[in-house]
Amino acid sequence: MKELETRVMDIDVDDIRNKMKSLAAIKVKSEDQVNEIYDFEDGRLLANKGYARVRTTIDRLTGKETVFMTTKKMLSQGTFKVMEENETIVEDGEMARRIFKSLGLVLQESISKYRESYKINDSLIEIDINDKSFCPFPYLEIETTSEEKLEEILKLIGYTLADTTSKTIYEILAERGIEGEIKGR
């Protein structure tokens, strides 16, 4: 599935929550995540702005655990990122890990974060608060289907396209001099 994706960095989390409430946005997620990023030993997926991932989520409201197996690949990067995402829920996280490993992929990094997601105008607005050792600042990720919808959402929450970035989180961290475990970042 293709999605348009952009980020707004260094947000005021309480301000965004208040805006979501005032806009009557529907809260669809409040979860803790562990994202295990896989790539080949030579790093070719990440070098081409893609990756394989096993994501384990724990819903903070119900306690339910869900495991997703995903591949992502950037198709283009301009005002926003156009991503191809292929994802499925799996019954057995360990089996998902073994499948990736059997394809020659190796675990590159394991990233913990809290994510709070809202739906508004057929778009998803996500507050991401990562483990500080990975990314020390909160940000918004907005996923939608058109530039028009993106501009509309941004206006509703007090931002413009100029406030956004299509850079990957790894590019943003590298720009800020924040080193990570993954080769080349």
Regions from the PLM with identified roles:
Residues 151-162:
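Long, well-ordered alpha-helical scaffolding segments within enzyme catalytic domains
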